[in-house]
Amino acid sequence: MAVVSGKLPSPKGEIDAPLKLAADGIHRIVAADGQTAVTKYRVLKEKTNTLVDVQLLTGRTHQIRVHFASLGHPLIGDHLYGQPDARIPYQALQATRLNFTDPFSEKRITAELPVPALFNQLLTEAPQIEPTI
């Protein structure tokens, strides 16, 4: 789950954009010669910004962050692919559901977390840009 800036063009979608390491050795970029990267999303709430449920079909470094930034909708608070926001000291991204098979009992385990209260505030409040010197 993530809060992205602005309103997405569609209530659900699939971002299929290959990623590779940028020349700076830190950032990832969308590039035709990159590794396959596919992200599905579904809008959960939309106001000034958008709360999205995200499903990764691949697992590339920074995949969610780069894919939404490439659409022009970076994650709120993302200092690498968007801009810092004084309201949140990290990017607005949280795993809300985790499924796995217990290796001992072989039972399917599901753990879920609620939407952080801060995420709902980020939907409507104006961004507070951190001053730079």
Residue ranges: model-predicted function:
Residues 1-133:
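RNA pseudouridine synthases
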